[in-house]
């Protein structure tokens, strides 16, 4: 543990800046803020909407993809030119990945019957176009399926929200009130109990 910790702290260019989790959970680190108090946030087919209007996407907006080559590995020089760090890429070499890759249609094989190399990469549109245009090296590029996205807040199966279709969710503003219902309670319950420290009870009519 100590050796690994030292390795990470001493190599910020490789692993990035180490951010410590605050003791006060109300001061959590925010990587990207897209909505403010009083706004209604929604994501429709990957597009962030505020109060029903699409916001301007960042120039270097990234999505995760699975990239299969025609056989060779992607050269380190190309990764450097694209700006993809070693920490941001995963080579899916373990045989345990094969079923999932085949289900996505990443089925290109070499003469020995082994699947051609597949990478999991975060790509901007420019990176995507550059790779896709290299027909000698790149066989297929598939956007990461929702099943790989992990958990979404709130942890409630009934919302069926995912990272590309999320909400709408109203962001509470100071002094404003909202009527709690069985449908919206999962959204605000944790905020009320864990962050505001209030007691919440649901009573029958």
Positions of PLM-derived features:
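Soluble "head" domains of membrane/secretory-pathway proteins
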Residues: 1-205
């Amino acid at each position: 543990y100590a050796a690994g910790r030292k390795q990470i702290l001493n190599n910020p260019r490789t692993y990035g800046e180490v951010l410590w989790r605050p003791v006060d959970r109300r001061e959590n680190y925010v990587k990207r803020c897209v909505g403010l108090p009083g706004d209604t946030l929604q994501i429709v087919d990957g597009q962030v909407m505020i109060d029903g209007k699409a916001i301007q996407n960042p120039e270097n907006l990234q999505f995760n993809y699975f990239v299969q080559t025609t056989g060779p590995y992607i050269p380190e020089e190309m990764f450097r030119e694209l700006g993809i760090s070693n920490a941001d890429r995963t080579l899916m070499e373990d045989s345990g990945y094969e079923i999932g890759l085949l289900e996505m249609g990443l089925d290109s094989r070499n003469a020995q019957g082994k699947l051609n190399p597949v990478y999991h990469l975060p790509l901007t549109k420019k990176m995507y176009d550059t790779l896709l245009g290299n027909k000698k090296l790149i066989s297929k590029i598939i956007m990461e399926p929702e099943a790989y996205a992990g958990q979404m807040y709130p942890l409630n199966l009934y919302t069926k929200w995912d990272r590309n279709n999320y909400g709408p969710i109203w962001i509470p503003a100071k002094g404003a009130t909202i009527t709690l219902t069985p449908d919206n309670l999962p959204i605000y319950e944790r905020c009320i109990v864990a962050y505001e420290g209030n007691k919440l009870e649901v009573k029958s009519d």
